[in-house]
């Protein structure tokens, strides 16, 4: 028997890393936190505006690495055609940003970072989320940010993180 008691936010070593969890109680056992994959839609403090889009939670992480640049304009023929079609104006979102791309000579995948020995905020986010409850329950875990990096570098895990979708929550496969 369990019931949701509301959202709980965990914040760890990287100041901009926090994620939502939901507290569950299965009496008479201790509280258990499960991570909430519904994104901001279950956050009662969040004002959802579909025209503005979701918060770009990873954008600061992406830009701070210094290996991407924003395109000066929409570069695809199809994208320019859609942009110039006035009959679509009533459908446009307010939040469309120009896309990013890797700077010349840069590899910007999580695997490339992992192989260079770099632990990204995305990797730390995954480790934190995968370890919910472990510390409180006295469970020693091996899912550290370094473990996540090693698994990605070895090709045993992937962390899809498109730079042009900074609203996407990091996850690991």
Explain the meaning of each model-derived region:
Residues 13-24, 28-173:
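Metallocofactor- and cofactor-centric catalytic cores in central/energy metabolism, strongly enriched
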Residues 1-5, 9:
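Single conserved hydrophobic/aromatic residue that forms the stacking wall/gate
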């Amino acid at each position: 028997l369990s019931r949701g008691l509301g959202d709980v936010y965990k914040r760890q070593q990287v100041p901009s890393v926090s994620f939502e969890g939901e507290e569950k109680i299965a009496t008479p056992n201790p509280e258990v936190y499960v991570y909430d994959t519904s994104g901001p839609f279950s956050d009662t403090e969040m004002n959802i505006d579909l025209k503005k889009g979701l918060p770009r939670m990873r954008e600061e992480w992406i830009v701070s690495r210094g290996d991407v640049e924003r395109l000066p304009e929409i570069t695809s023929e199809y994208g320019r055609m859609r942009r110039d079609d006035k009959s679509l104006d009533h459908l446009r979102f307010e939040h469309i940003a120009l896309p990013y791309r890797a700077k010349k000579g840069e590899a910007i995948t999580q695997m490339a970072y992992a192989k260079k020995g770099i632990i990204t905020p995305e990797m730390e986010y995954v480790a934190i989320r995968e370890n919910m409850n472990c510390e409180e329950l006295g469970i020693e875990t091996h899912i550290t940010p370094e473990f996540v990096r090693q698994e990605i570098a070895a090709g045993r895990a992937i962390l899809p993180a498109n730079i042009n979708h900074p609203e996407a929550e990091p996850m690991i496969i």
